[in-house]
From Swiss-Prot:
All residue ranges annotated as the BACK domain in the record: 88-133
Residue ranges of the TM segments: none
Lineage per the UniProt record: Viruses, Varidnaviria, Bamfordvirae, Nucleocytoviricota, Pokkesviricetes
Keywords: Early protein
N-terminal signal peptide: none
Annotated protein name in UniProt: Protein OPG030
UniProt cross-references to InterPro entries, sorted A to Z: Orthopox_C5
The encoding gene: OPG30
Induction (record text): Expressed in the early phase of the viral replicative cycle.
Family: Belongs to the orthopoxvirus OPG030 family.
Length: 134
């Protein structure tokens, strides 16, 4: 396998067993090696971000946030907006594309089960367009 991969698709590569079994070492390779994160899986990105927090590795956190920002800009939809919003809120991060998506789709979003699961502060944040969180 080429060590200078241009694209890393975590979902596909997980099934090809390219990882060593040591997720910490694999995660470090994303930052210090030649790999970039190209997965569009929100759950994989959250898992990697949590690992970066556990390792206190700011470079890995930055790489994951960069990819989550891309997902937020180009891939966000009705199936993943809630998970992405929760990720940004829980980590005290902001994203203008997420805010724009929510504002543009509020009529559809407010009638979803995910919206009904929000606490009062989150609902007020979304409905009032208060950019203190996202």
């Amino acid at each position: 396998m080429d060590t200078y991969m241009n694209r890393l698709d975590l979902d596909k590569l997980k099934h090809e067993n390219i990882f060593s079994g040591n997720i910490i070492e694999d995660a470090k390779e994303f930052v210090f090696g030649s790999r970039k994160i190209y997965t569009d899986s929100v759950n994989d990105l959250i898992e990697l971000y949590n690992l970066a927090k556990y390792l206190n590795n700011e470079k890995l956190k930055d790489v994951v946030i960069e990819r989550m920002d891309y997902v937020c800009k180009y891939i966000i939809g009705k199936d993943n907006w809630y998970t992405i919003y929760s990720f940004y809120k829980e980590n005290g991060l902001r994203n203008s594309f997420l805010r724009q998506y929510i504002n543009n789709n509020i009529e559809e979003i407010r009638n979803t089960d995910q919206f009904l699961k929000f606490d009062v502060d989150s609902v007020c944040d979304i409905l009032n367009n208060d950019e203190t969180i996202v």
